[in-house]
């Protein structure tokens, strides 16, 4: 069984679909260039029910950006695209657990120590010319993770779908997986049936 995170939620309907499906985490994207960007107003409409741990995704964030979100919504985890030092600073400042996103093309890219953080999101490096660091529906060769001794808890992401998540778990050894574009009918538009299918497939893996 792999735990499942559904990221990029923007509406109460899809948040409810993820929680009702049994998702282990729900994620919200606070990066304006992403089609999954959620505004503070939309976050308020989703509500403050914290039955499932919430994760906020930020890219090279200024502290004020995180503070604005935390005034509206508690976040159990910050998923940050930045260097280790910046991630540690945000962890110390806000007292939240921090997962650092790490782009991987080969085994050499995998973290070798915990960097003073709570975990990692391991995904493919963005394609050349991409305007965002994640959510690009691109997978990497999961076989590069064979023999890796993870220094902290981690989630596998990048190009995952209901159809391939079981194979990804087997090949990588992941105990947790993260999906965004793989449960969408169009960029930024989550599909309730795909959310249900993904969580079920991950939990059955």
Swiss-Prot record:
HAMAP family: PRAI. Pfam families: PRAI (PF00697). It catalyses: N-(5-phospho-beta-D-ribosyl)anthranilate = 1-(2-carboxyphenylamino)-1-deoxy-D-ribulose 5-phosphate. Its EC number is 5.3.1.24. Keywords: Amino-acid biosynthesis, Aromatic amino acid biosynthesis, Isomerase, Tryptophan biosynthesis. This is N-(5'-phosphoribosyl)anthranilate isomerase. Pathway: Amino-acid biosynthesis; L-tryptophan biosynthesis; L-tryptophan from chorismate: step 3/5. Belongs to the TrpF family. One of its GO terms (biological process) is L-tryptophan biosynthetic process. It comes from Acidiphilium cryptum (strain JF-5). The gene is trpF. GO terms for molecular function: phosphoribosylanthranilate isomerase activity. It comes from the Bacteria. InterPro entries: Aldolase_TIM, PRAI_dom, RibuloseP-bd_barrel, TrpF_fam.
């Amino acid at each position: 069984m792999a735990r499942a995170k559904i990221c990029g939620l923007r509406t109460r309907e899809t948040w409810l679909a993820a929680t009702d499906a049994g998702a282990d985490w729900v994620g919200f994207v606070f990066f304006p260039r992403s089609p999954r960007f959620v505004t503070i107003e939309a976050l308020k409409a989703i509500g403050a029910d914290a039955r499932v741990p919430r994760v906020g995704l930020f890219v090279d964030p200024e502290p004020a950006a995180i503070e604005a979100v935390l005034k509206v919504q508690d976040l159990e985890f910050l998923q940050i695209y930045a260097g280790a030092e910046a991630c540690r600073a945000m962890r110390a400042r806000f007292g939240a657990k921090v997962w650092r996103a790490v782009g991987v093309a080969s085994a050499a890219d995998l973290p070798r120590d915990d960097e003073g953080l709570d975990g990692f999101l391991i995904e493919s490096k963005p394609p050349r010319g991409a305007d965002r660091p994640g959510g690009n529906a691109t997978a990497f060769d999961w076989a590069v993770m064979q023999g890796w001794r993870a220094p902290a808890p981690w989630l596998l992401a990048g190009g995952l779908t209901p159809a391939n998540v079981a194979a990804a778990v087997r090949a990588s050894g992941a105990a947790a997986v993260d999906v965004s574009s793989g449960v969408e009918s169009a960029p930024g538009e989550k599909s309730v049936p795909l959310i249900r299918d993904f969580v079920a497939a991950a939990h059955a893996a």
